């Protein structure tokens, strides 16, 4: 589960246009973004896009069209892929797998009964990322000339490291966990803008790009980063379930009143009879000392400059292999080549 602090973050959000990100380097949480593409780019009954060999292509569609739109607008994306998850995340991953299996069964049942809206909702909940999705996503990004980094651990943590090092202007993720890892600025809805229909309601909402700054968030909440981490632990993170009956507002009161993690642990044990199922010190350590590569400016430039557009390869991969329309892909390939040539003229540090 991603940490549920959305209600507390609302006052620190600002809505921005895509133009505001022109010239900015954005470290994108790859798994989070790809998951969104797989989830929403589906047919009315929830069936994902596939090619002639029945390989899923929803993620490729999202990566190609939405990433190219960012680049055309002058944004400089770099995707960060998850590595090996912390041991403490195992229970969360197992629970997710169980929920997705149940959702898949519900999807098949709803489809057979002709309940398209329910089928689509269950299909979205059944979304998962496998090795094919990861591999094909990396191959597409490579052919597009879009840099990506393989993080040793959590992708959000590595993206936050790039932010703190001044190598990325912001992290992009739908999850607020990025703040717990110390991301200084988080962009939400970067690739999800537009009108969205609310589940089971004939209501559409406009989804806009949001910008949230950690410093402003902490200031509005009146807490430190450590206290924000404790707050997250109280409502639940990917590494612990959280305290029953303690919502974000109560968690804020508890975290802001405590000066140490020991004090937080003692308070919730006495008041709520709650003991963390995972060592709370271990959870805190995951956020304060995550498993990341300490990337500096030279290494970052080396990574980014190693990627270049392969026009023929891109058309072959997307059109010959996966059945996308050649005229659209060719136009995107030309645009990416022009953008790449412009960056090359500016030198390898143009990503900084």
PLM features: what roles do these ranges have?
Residues 73, 172, 279-281:
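A short, structural micro-pattern
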Residues 3-12, 16, 20-164, 184-186, ...:
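Noncatalytic, basic helical substrate-engagement surface that gates or grips nucleic-acid strands
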Residues 12, 16-25, 202-352:
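Non-catalytic nucleic-acid-binding/docking modules located in mid-to-C-terminal regions
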Residues 109, 115, 198-202, 345:
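Intrinsically disordered, low-complexity linkers and terminal tails enriched in Pro/Gly
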Residues 47, 126-277:
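Nuclease catalytic cores that cleave nucleic-acid phosphodiester bonds
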Residues 37, 89-90, 182, 190, ...:
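Intrinsically disordered, low-complexity regions enriched in proline, serine, glycine
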Residues 98-99, 168-169, 187, 346-347:
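Short alpha-helix boundary/capping motifs
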């Amino acid at each position: 589960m991603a940490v549920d602090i959305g209600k507390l973050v609302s006052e620190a959000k600002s809505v921005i246009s895509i133009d505001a990100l022109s010239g900015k380097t954005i470290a994108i949480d790859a798994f989070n973004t790809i998951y969104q593409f797989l989830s929403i780019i589906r047919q009315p009954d929830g069936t994902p896009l596939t090619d002639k060999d029945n390989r899923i292509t929803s993620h490729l569609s999202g990566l190609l069209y939405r990433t190219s739109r960012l680049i055309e607008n002058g944004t400089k994306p770099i995707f960060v892929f998850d590595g090996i998850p912390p041991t403490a995340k195992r229970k969360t991953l197992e629970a997710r797998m169980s929920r997705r299996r149940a959702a898949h069964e519900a999807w098949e049942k709803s489809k057979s009964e002709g309940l398209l809206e329910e089928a689509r909702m269950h299909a979205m909940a059944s979304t998962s990322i496998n090795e094919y999705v990861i591999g094909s996503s990396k191959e597409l990004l490579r052919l597009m000339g879009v840099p990506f980094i393989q993080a040793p651990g959590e992708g959000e943590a590595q993206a936050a490291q790039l932010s703190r090092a001044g190598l990325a202007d912001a992290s992009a993720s739908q999850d607020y966990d990025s703040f717990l890892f110390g991301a200084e600025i988080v962009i939400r809805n970067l690739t999800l803008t537009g009108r969205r229909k609310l589940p089971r309601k004939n209501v559409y909402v406009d989804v806009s790009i949001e910008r949230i700054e950690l410093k402003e968030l902490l200031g509005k909440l009146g807490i430190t980063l450590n206290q924000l981490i404790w707050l997250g632990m109280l409502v639940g993170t990917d590494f612990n379930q959280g305290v029953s009956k303690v919502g974000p507002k109560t968690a804020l009161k508890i975290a802001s009143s405590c000066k140490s993690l020991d004090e937080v642990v003692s308070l919730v044990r006495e008041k709520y009879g709650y003991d963390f199922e995972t060592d709370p010190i271990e959870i805190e350590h995951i956020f304060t000392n995550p498993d990341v590569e300490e990337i500096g400016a030279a290494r970052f430039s080396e990574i980014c400059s190693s990627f270049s557009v392969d026009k023929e390869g891109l058309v072959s991969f997307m059109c010959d292999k996966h059945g996308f329309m050649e005229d659209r892909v060719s136009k995107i390939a030309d645009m990416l080549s022009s953008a790449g040539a412009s960056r090359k003229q500016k030198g390898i540090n143009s990503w900084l």
